[in-house]
């Protein structure tokens, strides 16, 4: 193996591993059609992001949101990320946004119509709900999969930076 090839075979996997844990640059509209950028969301505060891509995701987000609002420190930003790439073309986007407004009126829910940000942030395909914790710089600290339970809530809270 050449002197150049060996360092590259080591560097590329490391670069991908680091990229998977850091928030990617994005601009997505929320359910109110307000644009949010990666810089807006990760603006010097810890972020708990609830994400999913199934029909029941808004219900699961609502349950997590309620529990997080009770137990997470007020300095933590709680946001949703809805992967909507699988929505059939004939379903009006406005009906999905209205449903999100109704279920999560006081929470930013980013609408990822192409599923690219969802994938780049490392959320699993086919997930009803996953909850990730990011530090103030957008570094992912961990992901908890599944509906809210006391055990999963404890896992999420343990991931929050001090």
Each model region followed by its residue ranges:
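Positively charged n-region of N-terminal signal peptides that target proteins for export
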Residues: 1-7
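Short, internal strand/loop/helix patches
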Residues: 79-81, 96-127
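Short active-site neighborhood of thiol/selenol oxidoreductases, capturing the structured segment around
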Residues: 41-61
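Short, small/polar residue-rich loop motifs at catalytic or cofactor-binding pockets
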Residues: 22-23, 126-128
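Structural microenvironment flanking redox-active thiols in thiol-disulfide oxidoreductases
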Residues: 56-101
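Thiol-/selenol-based redox modules, centered on thioredoxin-like
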Residues: 127-162
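Bacterial N-terminal signal peptides
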Residues: 7-17
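A short beta-strand-turn-helix
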Residues: 26-46
């Amino acid at each position: 193996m050449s002197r150049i090839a060996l360092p590259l075979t080591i560097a590329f996997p490391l670069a991908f591993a680091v990229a998977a844990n850091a928030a990617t640059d994005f601009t997505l509209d929320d359910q109110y059609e307000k644009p949010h950028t990666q810089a807006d969301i990760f603006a010097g505060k810890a972020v708990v992001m609830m994400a999913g891509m199934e029909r029941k995701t808004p219900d699961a987000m609502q349950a997590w949101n309620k529990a997080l609002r009770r137990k997470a420190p007020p300095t933590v930003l709680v946001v949703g990320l809805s992967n909507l790439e699988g929505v059939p073309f004939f379903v009006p986007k406005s009906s999905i946004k209205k449903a999100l407004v109704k279920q999560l009126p006081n929470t930013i829910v980013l609408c990822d119509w192409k599923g690219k940000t969802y994938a780049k942030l490392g959320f699993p395909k086919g997930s009803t709900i996953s909850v990730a914790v990011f530090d103030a710089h957008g570094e992912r600290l961990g992901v908890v999969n599944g509906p809210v339970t006391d055990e999963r809530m404890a896992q999420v809270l343990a991931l929050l930076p001090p």
